[in-house]
Amino acid sequence: MPLSPDPYSALRHAAKYVQQFRRKTFVVKLGGAMLSDPRLRRAACEQIALLWTFSIRPVVVHGGGPELDTLCDALHLPVEKVAGRRVTSAPVLDAAKMVLAGKLHTDLLADLQAAGVPAVGLSGVDAGLIKARKRPPVMVTEAGATEGKLVDYGLVGDIEQVDTRVVEHLRSADYVPVIAPLSGGTDGAVYNTNADTVAAALAVALSAEKLFFLVQVPGLLKNVSDPSSLVTLANLTDLATMESTGAIAGGMKPKAHAIRHALVGGVGSVHLVSGVQPNALLEEVFTNEGSGTMVVRENAQKPAGAVG
């Protein structure tokens, strides 16, 4: 958070947000690329710890794509993604279990504990938290393509139901749930499910005040190669425009879908925030200016840096 010439003024300013968000639910999704860097992972955990200290109720969801890619390479398994989403064979699913519910998950829990957060790890399989069905083959038109193609994503689950009872039980005892993006089928199958999708579904089911995506860039960018083209405020119409112009592509497309699902489902706002810039999450929560992009269903006024 930027230093103020008058630190007491900064504290008074932040205090109104502390009061406003007290006991509110924030779902925080940590990107896999950031989690692969222990320094960035610990910095994120320290920010989450401060939210918890201020009686904000965080629920953490994590990805793990880069570490899964690394393990697949080591195991000589193909890494295939279409429109930003992973194709998951049975061997790749086994690797995903090792990473998402294993090493990465445990390392994140350890760092949260070290930061003072009473974190408890779950996957979507635990207590039937995330119920899914296998995604059927779908037609996908990738960026730059003129025609779509039929894609079978393999053992990927589309969410059908979210049962938040285990999460609510943990939160009632002042624990912080940390959720890996695996889901369970009614037939006992386990599926790989996009972490952005899981975060949005949980945010809706928990009636979250806010959903945060911590990413490698400052937020939504009008020009993906220009960090200074940050969009500070956007609505769903703006989001659709950025998708149509190609400003949102690749791995950002699942995020756009998740943002839309969350906002239509009643989440107050969705924020894309840097997981690299120091204290960007805290700055987004506790200052007027914020640090990244806030997306809402509709906005009447747009400050400088907004779309349009």
Swiss-Prot record:
Return the EC number.
2.7.2.8
Q: Where is this site: Transition state stabilizer?
A: 29, 255
For this UniProt entry, which residues form the secretion signal?
A: none
Q: Specify one Pfam family.
A: AA_kinase
The residues the record assigns to binding substrate are 64-65, 86, 192
GO CC term (a single one): cytoplasm
Pathway of action:
Amino-acid biosynthesis; L-arginine biosynthesis; N(2)-acetyl-L-ornithine from L-glutamate: step 2/4
* Listed name of the protein: Acetylglutamate kinase
Q: Which organism is it from?
A: Myxococcus xanthus (strain DK1622)
